[in-house]
Amino acid sequence: MRPFCLGVLLAGGIAMVASVGLAQYAPAAAPYKVLKTAKVGGEGGFDYLFADAEARRLYMPRSGPMGQLTVFNMDTLEPVGAIADVRAGGAAVDPKSHHGFSTTKPITMWDSTTLKVVKTIDVEGRPDGIMFDPYNERVWILGHTPPYATVIDAKEGTVVGTLDLGGGAEQAVTDGRGKVYVNLSDIFNIAVVDAKNLTVTAHYDVSSKGYGFGSGLALDYKNHVLFAYYREPSAEVVIVNADNGNIITTLPTGVGVDTVVFNPATMEAISAENNGSMTFIKENSPTSFAVEQTLLTKSGAKTLALDTKTNHVLTMTADFAPAPANARK
């Protein structure tokens, strides 16, 4: 295996390249652009980023034998700490209890102020995605094998319950008022969940449009609009009425979307794509949408995080170093 280093990107609206990157919003006349890139280094795979806008911290979980949870100052992209032996795909923080969680197995719960591990929490399945729901201060652990969702009390660090969503859970969003929506990657629909009672109340089916392999999901909670991203047979976003599941329209995206976000400050749905692009979709009204910009980032930069304080978007990817001369092929 070739060694690689991670990087973060920043831009007038985006983050980019073999490091962590960040992008920043610009007026309509000026497109989004990459503002900054920062070399991260280190070993291990990577998946999701988590931005704690209030505490000004960016969390980057790393997997593999040398995996750890690396923490950065979100304004400078300088490292501020790490939690060793936390080999995870995703992380989330409850700003009220200052408890953080990462999708290790068992789940690791840590103090977001001190970065000290508080406890581990046994769960079933194969943890992957993660979401914090401020409605009732719970953390949702998502996976592609049953149980598809495990819900944890963020204050106590105890399992509240598990939920069979009917398919592999890719990304979840909350309206903050008692509803959670989950894009199911293998059955072509969106599960609607009562967050208080942990019951599935509806499935919004998009299979009639021929879409498969669901990935990212974003929500305009004010206007009740869902943005559900699909990779097959073509890369598109299906824009759905969150109240009844009716499809409003569809738009093209870049190839290989993973995580997405909706920025209510700019009324844009933003997706990071494995082919090295970031797509910005403008919501002109609850029934009118358009692809505003496709920004070139770097191959592999398929996940993102939004800094809601600055409207910066951060993404990351890996640069592969040349293999040593004596390396086995």
Which residues make up each language-model segment?
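Bacterial N-terminal signal peptides that target proteins for export
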Residues: 1-10
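Predominantly soluble domains enriched in secretory-pathway, periplasmic, or organellar proteins
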Residues: 11-329
